Amino acid sequence: MNKGRVTQIMGPVVDVKFDGGKLPEIYNALTVKQSNENGTSINLTFEVALHLGDDTVRTVAMSSTDGLVRGTEVEDTGKAISVPVGDATLGRVFNVLGDAIDLDGEVPADVRRDPIHRQAPAFEELSTKVEILETGIKVVDLLAPYIKGGKIGLFGGAGVGKTVLIQELINNIAQEHGGISVFAGVGERTREGNDLYHEMSDSGVIKKTAMVFGQMNEPPGARQRVALTGLTMAEHFRDEQGQDVLLFIDNIFRFTQAGSEVSALLGRMPSAVGYQPTLATEMGQLQERITSTNKGSITSIQAVYVPADDYTDPAPATTFAHLDATTNLERRLTQMGIYPAVDPLASTSRALSPEIVGEEHYEVARQVQQTLQRYKELQDIIAILGMDELSEEDKLVVHRARRIQFFLSQNFHVAEQFTGQKGSYVPVKETVRGFKEILEGKYDDLPEDAFRLVGGIEEVIENAKKMMA
């Protein structure tokens, strides 16, 4: 075994000197297992990041370096961090190193373990088939539909509902889809992960889900690598079992943020806004592995925090380039009480074309967007001069646009405990029919509030009857 000693500790970054000139390779895992003087045991894993010369390597710790001292002996494992894969991971909760952190005991020693670093699938192995993934959420299915085996980003600032939307998608898709899911909690709140675990346990979805967490309280090394741990588990189900896997990542921005912290500690020159100079490379290495091959598919749904609601920030801007569909959450809509607060004009999908979704769906979606865009243009006139100054045609546009805007809202199953109202799953056909009839003017006589937070168009009619009674 190749052994070295700790020569310098800078928070989560540790320098290790190896004698004899045999240095561990980049990405190799190094371990420390010993007790210090006051009797507390230290069990640490580092990942090699740089070769500094003078037989010294600079490493990043995967857990807190409290209690570590210079001179501590370190062992080279000779391979990268490896995590359990396969059916043994289902129903379990892991940390970045693949150690079980639930109450169901250790993972058996004979379970296969795969390294978290690997190449993306070769060009000729990739699949190009396009199939729509129904979510049951009206605004998504109509205006920015998701692709099976595609990459989807949920963009939004703090507190606009990204995690709630991810939880609803887990509820709707994982239960309907019935396949295997992997959830990676990257640098988010431990409470949310705990809530999600208990919700999934209650609904039974946990039996087909592997969960990996490296939350806000973890050092940056763990937050940076935990997405790769989850991805490695998902890749095994895709490549070895030919499964269609769902991969949820909450939050991909924290992956970038952790990379930025590590980069500064490793002594790299910062780039724009203080981010790491390797931002695009790191994001590309992760995203290119999340793909569909001839064997199976990985459909990934990633929450992306937008710092200070600024979409030009390098972190969200770099993520945009990799996605097939984007769902943009807007603070202005939360203030209007429209949930999910998805911006129907800013959200995009490459699947919204007549060849993929069909002519009728495409036409209805485009008409909805045109109506909302015209309403947006008229808002300045309304604010200055009032509704009375509009032409009859524009008054009708505003009238219908407000109904469309409210009808894009919906009650969620995961929010039942807050709203006291049952969540709704709306099939795509129902969604298209409902919006088509609103555009045709069938419901011009119904009150606006009847359209708020409902499922299908039948619920609107019921609400209107109650209001008019």
From Swiss-Prot:
UniProt-listed Enzyme Commission number(s): 7.1.2.2
Binding, ATP: 156-163
The entry's keywords: ATP synthesis, ATP-binding, Cell membrane, CF(1), Hydrogen ion transport, Ion transport, Membrane, Nucleotide-binding, Translocase, Transport
CDD domains associated with the record: ATP-synt_F1_beta_C (cd18110), ATP-synt_F1_beta_N (cd18115), F1-ATPase_beta_CD (cd01133)
TM stretches of this protein: none
GO CC, any one term: proton-transporting ATP synthase complex
Membrane topology according to the record: Peripheral membrane protein
EC class of the enzyme, as a word: translocase
Known catalytic reactions: ATP + H2O + 4 H(+)(in) = ADP + phosphate + 5 H(+)(out)
PANTHER family for this protein: ATP SYNTHASE, ATP SYNTHASE SUBUNIT BETA, MITOCHONDRIAL
Protein role: Produces ATP from ADP in the presence of a proton gradient across the membrane. The catalytic sites are hosted primarily by the beta subunits.
HAMAP family: ATP_synth_beta_bact
Family according to the record: Belongs to the ATPase alpha/beta chains family.
Quaternary context: F-type ATPases have 2 components, CF(1) - the catalytic core - and CF(0) - the membrane proton channel. CF(1) has five subunits: alpha(3), beta(3), gamma(1), delta(1), epsilon(1). CF(0) has three main subunits: a(1), b(2) and c(9-12). The alpha and beta chains form an alternating ring which encloses part of the gamma chain. CF(1) is attached to CF(0) by a central stalk formed by the gamma and epsilon chains, while a peripheral stalk is formed by the delta and b chains.
NCBIfam families reported for this sequence: atpD
Protein name, per record: ATP synthase subunit beta
Organism placement in taxonomy: Bacteria, Bacillati, Bacillota, Bacilli, Bacillales
